[in-house]
Swiss-Prot record:
Interacts with translational regulator CsrA and flagellin(s). The lineage of its organism: Bacteria, Bacillati, Bacillota, Clostridia, Lachnospirales. It comes from Lachnospira eligens (strain ATCC 27750 / DSM 3376 / VPI C15-48 / C15-B4). The gene is fliW. It comes from the Bacteria. Its main location: cytoplasm. Disulfide bonds: none annotated. Acts as an anti-CsrA protein, binds CsrA and prevents it from repressing translation of its target genes, one of which is flagellin. Binds to flagellin and participates in the assembly of the flagellum. Keywords: Bacterial flagellum biogenesis, Chaperone, Cytoplasm, Translation regulation. The keyword Cytoplasm applies. It is found in: Cytoplasm. This is Flagellar assembly factor FliW.
Length: 151
């Protein structure tokens, strides 16, 4: 299917690449269907990926795998909440992403470690949860970390 986006123009998205968030994403509860937009050739090494809403061209959230900035990232969430992803969750099918905030001054870029976005690529269901870990911040500064990784 063709999806109109503000930032990437018209993109082709196969049905099996659509992630459904039954409850939406925090702050964007009305939009339930998304896809990940990234350079497929650099998938393993790319730090920033875009979570693009299927039905809203202007809604594209920058996200990244938290391990890029926090190697030991291990959010504590209630197992009961994970059931929204499906009955038979396999660790191999799960990917965790965290939303970024990129202000005009990119040196103030932050990652939200407190509310991970969890996707089961077997069921293509996603959920955003609040981690119980007190050490995880909503606005964890990452500019210096990304700059160091770039060099």
């Amino acid at each position: 299917m063709k999806v109109q986006t503000k930032w990437f123009g018209e993109i082709e998205v196969s049905e099996d690449k659509i992630i459904t968030f039954d409850k939406g994403i925090i702050g964007f509860e009305d939009w339930k269907k998304y896809t990940l937009v990234y350079d497929a050739e650099k998938e393993e090494n790319i730090s920033i990926i875009w979570l693009q809403a299927i039905d809203e061209p202007t809604l594209a959230l920058p996200v990244m795998k938290p391990e890029f900035v926090f190697e030991t990232y291990d959010p504590v969430v209630e197992d009961e909440l994970l059931k929204a992803l499906g009955d038979d969750i396999q660790d191999d099918n799960i990917r965790v992403y965290c939303a970024l905030t990129v202000p005009r001054d990119i040196t103030k870029m932050t990652i939200n470690l407190k509310a991970p976005i969890i996707v089961d690529f077997d069921t293509m269901k996603g959920i955003q949860l609040i981690a119980d870990n007190s050490e995880y911040q909503v606005r964890y500064p990452i500019y210096d970390i990304l700059k160091k990784e770039e060099n």
